[in-house]
Amino acid sequence: MNPEYDYLFKLLLIGDSGVGKSCLLLRFADDTYTESYISTIGVDFKIRTIELDGKTIKLQIWDTAGQERFRTITSSYYRGAHGIIVVYDVTDQESYANVKQWLQEIDRYASENVNKLLVGNKSDLTTKKVVDNTTAKEFADSLGVPFLETSAKNATNVEQAFMTMAAEIKKRMGPGAASGGERPNLKIDSTPVKPASGGCC
């Protein structure tokens, strides 16, 4: 058994461009925040190790580009994911409306029993908020998916979002899945990244 961790979970952040996926990842992995917006090109990832119920869990969190032109690259990353976090911007009605489309992408590309979490980001922008918490919560409940509102800027619920996801995956896997059980499926495909070098600047 690898002494460094008991579990390795691969998580995926998806959602429209500009909803704050990269900011959530930066806040959780590095506890930093930046106001400057640089759109993710293709796929990026960070790793953070957490403790949960006395177990060490290594989270490999993949941040995907929201733009349509990267969809063929990012879709290949759904396959090995244990958990997928769908992010929308509480100040952007369109990003919330598109959640259904993102959920369809999960159904199309991810494994059948993948864990899902719905996150409404930018909750600090209270005066600009257009997506009601109750509406989103009812929608998430109808799907049986956990829901949280977060703010990467002031760190509200960011830790909780990733910890919730890790706990849900661990619960689904059960005690017998530690270490060896899931790891063979976690070989990361390097091939899908190659199209990114094909001139989409």
From Swiss-Prot:
Residues 174-201 are annotated as: Disordered. Mg(2+) binds at S22, T40, D63. GTP binds at residues 17-23, 33-36, 39-40, 66, 121-122, 124, 151-153. It is found in: Cytoplasm; Membrane; Preautophagosomal structure membrane; Cytoplasm, Perinuclear region. Its EC number is 3.6.5.2. GO terms for cellular component: endoplasmic reticulum-Golgi intermediate compartment; Golgi apparatus; mitochondrion; perinuclear region of cytoplasm; phagophore assembly site membrane. GO terms for biological process: autophagy; endoplasmic reticulum to Golgi vesicle-mediated transport; Golgi organization; positive regulation of glycoprotein metabolic process; protein transport; regulation of autophagosome assembly; virion assembly. CDD domains: Rab1_Ypt1. Its main location: cytoplasm. Prenylated; by GGTase II, only after interaction of the substrate with Rab escort protein 1 (REP1). The modification N-acetylmethionine is found at M1. Regulated by guanine nucleotide exchange factors (GEFs) which promote the exchange of bound GDP for free GTP. Regulated by GTPase activating proteins (GAPs) including TBC1D20 which increases the GTP hydrolysis activity. Inhibited by GDP dissociation inhibitors (GDIs). It is a lipid-anchor. Keywords: Acetylation, Autophagy, Cytoplasm, GTP-binding, Hydrolase, Lipoprotein, Magnesium, Membrane, Metal-binding, Methylation, Nucleotide-binding, Phosphoprotein, Prenylation, Protein transport, Transport. A motif (Switch 1) lies at residues 30-45. It catalyses: GTP + H2O = GDP + phosphate + H(+). A motif (Switch 2) lies at residues 65-80. Residues 64-83 are annotated as: Switch 2 region. The modification Cysteine methyl ester is found at C201. NCBIfam families: small_GTP (TIGR00231). Belongs to the small GTPase superfamily. Rab family. The small GTPases Rab are key regulators of intracellular membrane trafficking, from the formation of transport vesicles to their fusion with membranes. Rabs cycle between an inactive GDP-bound form and an active GTP-bound form that is able to recruit to membranes different set of downstream effectors directly responsible for vesicle formation, movement, tethering and fusion. Plays a role in the initial events of the autophagic vacuole development which take place at specialized regions of the endoplasmic reticulum. Switch 1, switch 2 and the interswitch regions are characteristic of Rab GTPases and mediate the interactions with Rab downstream effectors. The switch regions undergo conformational changes upon nucleotide binding which drives interaction with specific sets of effector proteins, with most effectors only binding to GTP-bound Rab. This is Ras-related protein Rab-1B. It comes from Mus musculus. The lineage of its organism: Eukaryota, Metazoa, Chordata, Craniata, Vertebrata.
